[in-house]
Amino acid sequence: MQDFWHAASAQLESELTPQQFKTWIKPLTPLSFDEQACMLRIAAPNRFKLDWVKSQFSGRIQSLACDYWEMQVDVQFVLDPTAGQRQAAMQPALAPMPMQPLAAQTMQAQAVPREAPARPTMAPYRETPMATAAHAAADIDVPVMDAAEASTQSYRVPAPAAPAVMGGLSAPPAAPVDDTVHERSRLNPILTFDNLVTGKANQLARAAAVQVANNPGKSYNPLYLYGGVGLGKTHLIHAIGNFMLMENPRARIRYIHAEQYVSDVVKAYQRKAFDDFKRYYHSLDLLLIDDIQFFSGKNRTQEEFFYAFEALIANRAQVIITSDTYPKEITGIDDRLISRFDSGLTVAIEPPELEMRVAILMKKAQAENVTVPEEVAFFVAKHLRSNVRELEGALRKILAYSNFHGKEITIEVTREALKDLLTVQNRQISVENIQKTCADFYNIKVADMYSKKRPANIARPRQIAMYLAKELTQKSLPEIGELFGGRDHTTVLHAVRKIADERSKDAQLNHELHVLEQTLKG
């Protein structure tokens, strides 16, 4: 049986991307093979992986088993019997954190730039007196939601088995959610699973979000989503909240940016209203907290959030967190909080691939009731790779230019509308600039990028530069090879695959690549 699994794993590794193999196949464990019953049993480490492997890979694994034993073999996927031991509840460490003076926190909170103007306060929770008291004491600013924004669209959640398709299974019928519910929760009713474009970059995060929305407090608690700016983290957590509200409009849900949570802690301290503050946050059914990295260095805020987190988990309430980086890479956050973040499911959201970027543009254009030719969408998607917000901004420029000049949207019109943006992109993201940036970063000479030298301190940065050239420019593999001293395209392909595979395993390398990408993108 072990010989079979070794051979099957090798075959699957050659068929799948490194990330797919590492995420789905590597964690599986062959348990037994019954020759009389022709039954192979394979264990998955948790329910999420079990369901996904059964829906996505069971047929291929069964086919490999039949070929190996040269007979019909049934494959049974089960939950790892030792999974429960690994999921044992962590005991809360109640020793107080080092306290930072609240005056200092107040200054830090005020120093953080706010992206949105001050907004009027909305009505507090009416269901519970404690919620009303907390709102009054903390003087929490709640964004106004225009009544026209309350979407009447259906809330359909695609099944995890078909992550690349928008739409799918319908949610159970539910009473309409009125505006005041969204005002209390701070949820944006426009951000749903229905209008989230799904691709390889976010399919795992979306599948986890769907699972949590259907089983709050039971599946993956907390759910921790991380990735760069504009990749859809906020959209996903709003979609979870909106789905839960459709099923239960009386659910106590709160979306809050970490910066606002810091401000609430400061206000509660100033008004001596911590009891009300705690009663409110500890009584929620779902807490959605965005950009948790803003807690860095704010010890009193971390203290209060720790107690809120413990209370919510103990009450089987769901906690969902987003950040721009992996939990253990956040600086200035207490270790016991980091361990809590790591105790659930942590999922990365990557920049969208080409096909997903095209789908996003077409979806956004459809929402604007504008027809954008597919070749235009591909042109934009090929040149803009960073995130969804960048794509949205480019589309707005194209539409504005087209309307102002009274021209149909073509590639020529698009090129003219985006000429400034494309000039910046082409100037910044060139192979030559990548080579210089990598050489400076790793303290080698630019000439080493073209040389035939093979010491590790030179070969490694050169491979990283090749990887970035493939990811961030439009150059083909032969063109990149030519710019790296006339190397063969297979050498470039080897470097790209090697760095891509190691990036998914090596946190330090991933951090270095993130820094280089941000430097190159300006």
Swiss-Prot record:
Domain of life: Bacteria
PROSITE patterns: DNAA
Pfam family, one: Bac_DnaA
Subcellular location field: Cytoplasm
Region (Domain IV, binds dsDNA) location: 403-522
Keywords per UniProt: ATP-binding, Cytoplasm, DNA replication, DNA-binding, Lipid-binding, Nucleotide-binding
Signal sequence, start to end: none
Molecular function GO labels: ATP binding; ATP hydrolysis activity; DNA replication origin binding; lipid binding
Binding-site positions, ATP: G230, G232, K233, T234
Biological process according to GO: DNA replication initiation; regulation of DNA replication
Region (Domain I, interacts with DnaA modulators): 1-71
Domain II: region residues: 71-185
Location of the region described as Domain III, AAA+ region in the Swiss-Prot/TrEMBL record: 186-402
GO CC field: cytoplasm; plasma membrane
InterPro entries according to UniProt: AAA+_ATPase, Chromosome_initiator_DnaA, Chromosome_initiator_DnaA-like, Chromosome_initiator_DnaA_CS, DnaA_C, DnaA_dom, DnaA_N_dom, DnaA_N_sf
Matches recorded under HAMAP family: DnaA_bact
PANTHER family (UniProt xref): CHROMOSOMAL REPLICATION INITIATOR PROTEIN DNAA
The record's note on its domains: Domain I is involved in oligomerization and binding regulators, domain II is flexibile and of varying length in different bacteria, domain III forms the AAA+ region, while domain IV binds dsDNA.
UniProt family annotation: Belongs to the DnaA family.
Summary of the function given for this chain in its UniProt record: Plays an essential role in the initiation and regulation of chromosomal replication. ATP-DnaA binds to the origin of replication (oriC) to initiate formation of the DNA replication initiation complex once per cell cycle. Binds the DnaA box (a 9 base pair repeat at the origin) and separates the double-stranded (ds)DNA. Forms a right-handed helical filament on oriC DNA; dsDNA binds to the exterior of the filament while single-stranded (ss)DNA is stabiized in the filament's interior.
Subunit structure: Oligomerizes as a right-handed, spiral filament on DNA at oriC.
Protein name: Chromosomal replication initiator protein DnaA
Taxonomic lineage from the root: Bacteria, Pseudomonadati, Pseudomonadota, Betaproteobacteria, Burkholderiales
